[in-house]
Amino acid sequence: TCNRVELLAMGKGDLAGQMLNSWAGVRNAKVEDLERYVYTYKNEEAVRHLFRVASSLDSMILGEPQILGQLKAAYRKASACHATGVILNHLLHKAFSVAKRVRTETAVASSAVSISFAAVELAKRIFGTMQGHKAMLIGAGEMAERRR
């Protein structure tokens, strides 16, 4: 997602430790430095977390629509590389179904906005108008492009 990295895996042994070691290697960082930023979920807790993320219940802006799209894009890439397997395929499809149900059966998406939209609204509250003021967008992602 925009403000974090989520890694999903299924298997035996200490997968969390193996993934953290791999991530540290990729980032050229020490495992100890990364550990304080890592949350690990297993079994039912992991499934619950995935469903909350997919449904945008675990995001900076409740109901943010971009997260589900990011998850689907990541799933498509992983699936194309044959990196998901039967159980993760089923789990992710279920997560997509749960997310759709949450969006259609609750009001979670009724006031959903993006982080960039929230930032612009806050700036308007502070300055009254953006006319005559300059702003700098840090980052070059899709959200920055949409707010020009």
Features from the language model and the residues they span:
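A glycine-rich (often HGG/GG-containing) alpha/beta subdomain
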Residues: T1-S59
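Glycine/serine-rich phosphate-binding loop and adjoining beta1-alpha1 elements at the start
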Residues: D33-Q131
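Glycine-rich phosphate/diphosphate-binding loop of Rossmann-like nucleotide-binding domains
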Residues: V120-R148
